[in-house]
Amino acid sequence: MSSVVVVGTQWGDEGKGKITDFLSENAEAIARYQGGNNAGHTIKFDGVTYKLHLIPSGIFYKEKISVIGNGMVVDPKALVEELKYLHDKGVDTSNLRISNRAHIILPYHIRIDEADEERKGANKIGTTKKGIGPAYMDKAARVGIRIIDLLDKETFKEKLEHNLGEKNRLLERFYELEGFKLEDILEEYYDYGQQFKEYVCDTSVVLNDALDDGKRVLFEGAQGVMLDIDQGTYPFVTSSNPIAGGVTIGSGVGPSKINHVVGVAKAYTTRVGDGPFPTELFDSIGDTIREVGHEYGTTTGRPRRVGWFDSVVVRHARRVSGLTDLSLTLLDVLTGIETLKICVAYKLDGKTITEFPASLKDLARCEPVYEELPGWTEDITGVTSLDDLPVNCRHYMERIAQLTGVQVSMFSVGPDRAQTHVIKSVWRLA
């Protein structure tokens, strides 16, 4: 039995999809455990670029099981569209398994999400307006509708009818928007469920059976630790738990069955949406990194905010997710920058702090304390091992490992799978 969890250590968009895809080669089951179609990941497979939002990146290996876990919120319409997108590209999806316990996103969740962001104005969270938050709210309020409910028309109608009474009052009286009619949703969404019912099962059983049979299971997180609802920059967070602890809740696999946790970190830092960002760059270096790194959201197309590598953030991720390994991505983007900076601590009201503050008011006042390192000019996109990297690049990686307290076990120097390199296997048994 061997299991690996892949988590983002920053604010998402760290390259988790690419690393998950790479590690999938040695896994026999790949599972997502939280989030929904608010997270996009881009994967290159056999020279073709794919953009996925819901379906795990292991879908391209037809002999491996790909799991949408119970902790996810699934937009049935988006799922059907994504399946069609894959089928149109000739991808076999018979290896997909969808948890019957996962909650679904309905049109009223999306409308409420949009209206709420609009209402907040300058205080908006910066959501993707995909209905994720409102769906998780319904789950916590015990009025959510699950996949298993969607497949039973009578149950679906009963729950939908009950929810529409409340949602329409909210939309019409509070947001002054038009509500929904039962018939607007019932037939269309029941039909979506029928289109993917062949994949629906108890995925906790599937995953535990795989682990008990000695198979390798990979758990794929969405977003990142700093977007975790408990450990992130609240309230500028997502509505679920991307940290490694979210695996046990969102997949139905106990913590004793988790072996390694791989934290994926960019060689710099990015963020989409609002909220404090201590190392953010507003100069030409920031613009260069954004353009060279193609730092635009997979889901929204929004330009990402760019900053220097922040070891305070990644240390926080190490602690709350129990990181055993680090995978450093997009090193090639930093090529040509004469002097690189790493944030080693923050200055808050004249005092040096080395741990990430819980208060956003404090975080907004934090000034980064930087350590400067010489950059490199050599093209590193074609390297095949750690030894091929320029000395300054290796020093940069070593310093990140020292400052974060996590060994760098993998690094990536480009978008293709062949540009991801292993220093130490994360599938090791010890």
Curated annotation (Swiss-Prot):
What stretches pass through the bilayer?
none
What's any one GO cellular component for it?
cytoplasm
What binding details are noted for the cofactor?
Answer: Binds 1 Mg(2+) ion per subunit.
Q: Which reaction does it catalyse?
A: IMP + L-aspartate + GTP = N(6)-(1,2-dicarboxyethyl)-AMP + GDP + phosphate + 2 H(+)
Question: What cofactor does this one take?
Answer: Mg(2+)
Carries keyword Cell inner membrane? no
Localization annotation? Cytoplasm
Could you say which residues bind GTP here? Answer: 12-18, 40-42, 304, 330-332, 412-414
According to its UniProt record, in which pathway does this protein act?
Purine metabolism; AMP biosynthesis via de novo pathway; AMP from IMP: step 1/2
The residue range of the signal peptide is: none
Which residues does Mg(2+) bind?
Answer: 13, 40
Query: Which keywords are on file for this protein?
Result: Cytoplasm, GTP-binding, Ligase, Magnesium, Metal-binding, Nucleotide-binding, Purine biosynthesis
Q: Which GO terms describe its molecular function?
A: adenylosuccinate synthase activity; GTP binding; magnesium ion binding
**Listed GO biological process terms:** 'de novo' AMP biosynthetic process; IMP metabolic process
Positions that bind substrate: 298-304
What SUPFAM superfamilies does the entry give? P-loop containing nucleoside triphosphate hydrolases
Which residues participate in IMP binding?
13-16, 38-41, 128, 142, 223, 238, 302
The keyword Ligase belongs to this UniProt entry's keyword annotation? yes
Q: What family does the Swiss-Prot or TrEMBL record give for this protein? A: Belongs to the adenylosuccinate synthetase family.
Q: So what does this one do?
A: Plays an important role in the de novo pathway of purine nucleotide biosynthesis. Catalyzes the first committed step in the biosynthesis of AMP from IMP.
Q: Which NCBIfam families match?
A: PRK01117.1, purA
Please report the name of this protein according to its UniProt entry.
Adenylosuccinate synthetase
